[in-house]
Amino acid sequence: MRYFSTRDKKLNFSFREIFSRGLAPDGGLFIPSEIKKYSNSELKSLQDLSYTDLATEIISNFCSPDLDKQKLKILVSKAYNNFATKEVVKIKKVGDIYLLELYHGPTLAFKDIAMQVIGNLYDELNIADKKKVNIVVATS
């Protein structure tokens, strides 16, 4: 997958490059060169996957070839292993309303859903590059 800058489509980068940069050198945002369109049969095959397998399937579209699907699955599984529930997120019905519980991560915040995976991706991508990274996250 290649990514380009919103300010200059001639600037394009790999997943590894955008992950370590954050913003494009021209100050633009990174946009994927393509977004996979799932067929109805593909969507149907996704509906019974665990949250971890679904996350792996979707994220893999954006990080290939820099990170293969098997390695990604290990990183995603590791990220969600320390959640309080094996489902990672739970849906709870209260009367006629369905609530999505996003607080089962290690800090009890919805941000755990993304940040646990992102932390593992930084570890994996920077181990190969021998870089150190500090991630600063603010609470909502």
Residue ranges and their predicted role:
Residues 1-140:
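PLP-dependent amino-acid enzyme catalytic core
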